[in-house]
Amino acid sequence: MSLVSSPVTRVLLASLCVTGALHAQPVTPRAMTLRDWYRVTTVSQPAVSPSGTHVAFTVTTVRETENKRHQEVWVATIDGGAPQRWTSPGYESSAPRWSPDGTHLLFTSTRPQGKGNTWVIRVDAPGGEAMQLPTMPTTGSVPTGGAFAVWAEQTPIDTAPLRDAFARMPALARPPFDALTMPADPTRFDGRHFVDISFKSNDRGFVASRRTARNWRVAQLWKQSFGDTSKVQLTRGNYSHRSPSVSPDGQWIAFVADARLRADSVVDMERDSLGRLPYDRTRDETERNESDIYVMPISGGTPRKVAEWMGAESDLEWSANGTSLAFIGRPARAKSARIYVIPVTGGAPKNVVGAWQYEPDAITWMSNGTIRFSSSIGGRAAILDADMNGGAPKEVVGGRRRATSPSMNTTGTVMAYVSTSMTKPTELFVSDADGGNERQLTHFNDALNAEVAWSDAERFTYRSVGNLEIEGWLMKPYGYVTGKKYPVVLYIHGGPHSQYNEGWFDEFQNLAAQGMFVLFTNPRGSSGYGADFTYSTRGRWGMEDYDDLMKATDIIARRADIDSTKMGASGGSYGGFMTTWIATKTQRFAAIQTDRTITDWTYWYGASDAQGLTEYEFFGKPWDNQALYDRLSPIRYVRNVRTPMLLVQSEDDFRTAMGSAEIWYTSLKKLGVPAEFVRYPRSNHDLSRTGEPWLLVDRLGRLRQWFGYWLQGTKTAAPAATAAAGGGTH
């Protein structure tokens, strides 16, 4: 399939798509409608060319009539010329990456008859065919000036070592192979048969169990030149090699592996064994040396241990002179990650961010020997430079926004990144190395931004239980008039170890456009404030975090422009748990909407694909700590609920399974509490983020209608057509 036929055509198409807003007539900004969601364009994955003259990036749009998202790779010049589409609109393409000499652009694409997902375009011959690299991913490590990539990949199943777990670990809860039941007639059995603990996944659905001895597929290192169509295996052995990084001269590979280079099957069985034991704080909370950093010649040989360090290492990066390695290290699950540097010859790792509490990401060595990285600092996201002497990092790109995904050219003079704020969807920006001379390179959303009055939010902080500072925001409704009172909806994020932030968010804009204030906070348990803050809710979900949310509600309810009799609450996942918890503890809210809810923790443990969450958060399995699981389950207090509730659930959600919502809905109906229950097909836990566009927008519309009725007295309009059989209202 040919790409866009010529550079001239590319520029013309790009001009029509990107600069059309320049010729649009001025309009009076209006409120967001549901159809506007389909028009938002997202920019991501920037990659600066080695010469620093171009930036490749991924553009994601929504094809409304096809009910799908669409991704393409575009390229912009640093001097501000119109961006050009570089991949065919007939295929899905993303994750661009330049070859070290800048002559090729690699990207991921799903195409018919393809034997893999990696394709490459010759930059010096634009408009030609994309060539496939059937075995190479776009995520490998490439040496400076090199013409090859190295990556970690699981061995083929037919060459993987056999894991004989049943002879060595008879306590594993799986019957012997010769004891497994078989269908009486395979042609008449279309059910599912499971014998493994991992039998379903939110991403993959139901996972079939193997009926034979399991082969253990360890991750080996592979190499492929850009001009080749086949890969070469560089490592052997029965342990996995992770986070590979090739030295600048292409002669050495650094990687992370088990601290004792034990076989993966042994490590896995040890963890299985520990996982079956009752929770023990001394054993389970003690820092362990689970992995270490090794270096080996790219030609092969015995790995040499570079660092023996407590905790886990990742994101290895060589310094430009090849003498040092930087990595992100986390001493233990509930400890903050730090950036460390260690000589390749060995020695003690040096912490280059000191006691800085925030989490680093995307580390890169600069040409001057410093390390650049991105980080969430509360609700902001900034790009920073580490102080190599261990002082506080210095912000290079900051402000009230989210600036992420920094990419630089070979000499470190040009930086590209994506940026979004409360009132601006994501666009591509570039700057000089020091963050100066910032320019916006893309304007995909300019026409929409001029047409729609996106609502901004006022940031505030407050002191909660234990004098802990909490960050929050209050978004004003569309058409705000001084002296008028408005309803407010409290939003509660999932996780709980995630966050709300300073970026554009469709859900907040959706309700603000309906004429409501939107209150959102990052209560204790949120990420972005350090590990101590994040894990302060262990064993205490619904306690001080609930107080944090109610304290914010108290503050906002005292405002003259808030109607404290017309307050609502909404949340999903952890927020779904918290909204049902709130409903059992207070009647201050006039209406509540709960997504992906959790109402009974013992049920959740058995029905979820993520049991490890509560094993850690609640200090063991239900039978280890049944009293805590029961005490924190909203269903135990459902008789207290009086607030009307809308329940939204996805049919294929294997993270927070359907039963939690069914239990709650049935209970509310028996109690006589007004309740609605909406179930979405073909959707998993991520419906509100990556679900089918039509269903995602339908959900946004139902939130408007639900809170519109209970908080504003707006009656729901009659449907345009009768629902088809099998759907609609029952």
Where do the PLM segments sit?
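Hydrophobic core register within WD40 beta-propeller blades
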Residues: 46, 96, 142-143, 244, ...
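Residue-level detector of Asp-centered blade-edge/turn motifs that repeat once per structural unit
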Residues: 50-51, 100-101, 144-145, 248-249, ...
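Bacterial N-terminal signal peptides
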Residues: 10-20
